[in-house]
């Protein structure tokens, strides 16, 4: 997938960025075409070789019509998780690394359910906050609304998920 200057994209686990320049950088003794991306979260800049963009997981923003599917994941009430926190953490980390917004929504929903049952570990709490930020910031960019508005929509979806989950009973998966 190729990007142009000014394109917004997603850098997995870091969030939305903008391609500021496309130039060449020297490494391994050769010049390689590279994207210089400014991450909107903290204004930091990363340089990604064009040839590595797929491997790194750079992707365009989620399409506007796919946002509905993300909210469906958030509110569906289904819960899949490894029983112990280490297994759950690894499972969720793999989903976070995929960079797909639907996978990140699944992580957020699952961790939201777990935190309703017990206190999250420090690492899971950080992952929960990161997943929430990544979802809110990307959907705000795609939909042209504020992060505060998206935050409210995400909270409502998570509340519906918990209500659905509770209606299924304690042994439902």
Task: Place the predicted regions along the sequence by residue.
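Loop/turn positions that initiate beta-strands
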Residues: 6-7
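Conserved hydrophobic positions within beta-strands
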Residues: 17-19
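A short macromolecule-binding patch
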Residues: 36-51
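Charge/polar-rich, low-complexity and marginally structured segments
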Residues: 51, 56-173
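Short, solvent-exposed secondary-structure boundary/capping segments
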Residues: 25-36
